[in-house]
UniProtKB/Swiss-Prot annotation:
The keyword Nucleotide-binding does not apply. This is 3-isopropylmalate dehydratase small subunit 2. Catalyzes the isomerization between 2-isopropylmalate and 3-isopropylmalate, via the formation of 2-isopropylmaleate. Pathway: Amino-acid biosynthesis; L-leucine biosynthesis; L-leucine from 3-methyl-2-oxobutanoate: step 2/4. GO terms for molecular function: 3-isopropylmalate dehydratase activity. Keywords: Amino-acid biosynthesis, Branched-chain amino acid biosynthesis, Leucine biosynthesis, Lyase.
Amino acid sequence: MVVKIKGKVFVFGDNVNTDEIIPARYLNTSDPQELAKYCMEDARPGFGRRDDIKGSIIVAGENFGCGSSREHAPVAIKAAGISCVIAKSFARIFFRNAINIGLPIVELKEADEFEEGDIAEVDLENGVVRNLTKGKEYRIRPYPEFLMKIMEAGGWLEYCLKEVGE
């Protein structure tokens, strides 16, 4: 079960939209590994092709994932190896799409206290986010048991298939 997530922080600002996360010019494929190459391409060119993003955590400001409803956006983030997204707030459709594909996301009003390169730890079950670099701890609402099961299964579809198979 994905309970604790730890990784290097990459900071993005407010209103990061789905076109910045995965630009429309790359939507001619649904292959997650192809999408991963262009993750965050219009927000930070070349980000998806960096070697040091595997297992990292994106920390952003308000309204992350706004814009068009595009499941490709959280798929690109997850396929690039990003383990979690922390933001002050999320566009509701992005939030749901991320949960559906098994990408952990966390709303944290103090997200702007993180800096590029900090090491963060997220405990979904107990509702704690830590900035290990600065020695700070923040309380968040823990994931409910149902969402933890979706995360454990790897996404909504995988969860449903598991439930049907049992």
